[in-house]
């Protein structure tokens, strides 16, 4: 509020969206949506415009997360879409952040395997490093299931590669 001019100053909720990302990381996990009643708070006296259901639907279909006013809970960010056009789980902020987090954790855990002999011990070390990470994410409501496939062939060993595929099923 601008007390000198006795009027409200309206700021975009972008500042709150960024804060909600950080707060979500600090209070839960990055794969939780930084939106909704629990994690979607907008720090304001009131919204500049109170949306109606038709407004919210139109915004969400256009990949814009609406800001919704609740009588009891205040103003909240009410959506978690990103700008991906295709309709899939990948157009959700929480799923994108889940993938980024898993990728980072696995990369860090597997650094010690680089330049190791390409044998069954290294393959087992990889699985020993990756499975607990994915088990932890599953235990903390990020994924409901996963599968790790290591395609260890003679050709890949000769190229000093350990190709693998990790399949995950994000929690909806």
Where are these regions (language model features)?
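Structured, hydrophobic secondary-structure cores that serve as assembly/anchoring elements
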Residues: 1-172
């Amino acid at each position: 509020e601008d007390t000198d001019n006795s009027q409200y100053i309206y700021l975009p909720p972008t500042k709150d969206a960024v804060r909600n990302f950080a707060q979500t990381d600090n209070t839960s996990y990055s794969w939780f949506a930084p939106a909704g009643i629990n994690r979607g708070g907008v720090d304001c006296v009131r919204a500049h415009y109170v949306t109606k259901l038709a407004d919210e639907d139109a915004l969400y279909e256009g990949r814009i997360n609406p800001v919704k006013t609740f009588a009891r809970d205040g103003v909240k960010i009410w959506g978690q879409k990103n700008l991906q056009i295709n309709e899939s789980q990948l157009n959700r902020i929480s799923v994108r952040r889940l993938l980024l987090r898993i990728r980072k954790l696995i990369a860090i855990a597997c650094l010690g395997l680089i330049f190791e002999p390409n044998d069954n011990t290294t393959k087992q070390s990889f699985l020993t490093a990756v499975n607990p990470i994915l088990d932890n994410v599953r235990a903390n409501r990020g994924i409901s299931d996963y599968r790790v496939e290591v395609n260890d062939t003679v050709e890949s060993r000769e190229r000093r590669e350990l190709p693998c595929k990790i399949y995950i099923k994000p929690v909806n």
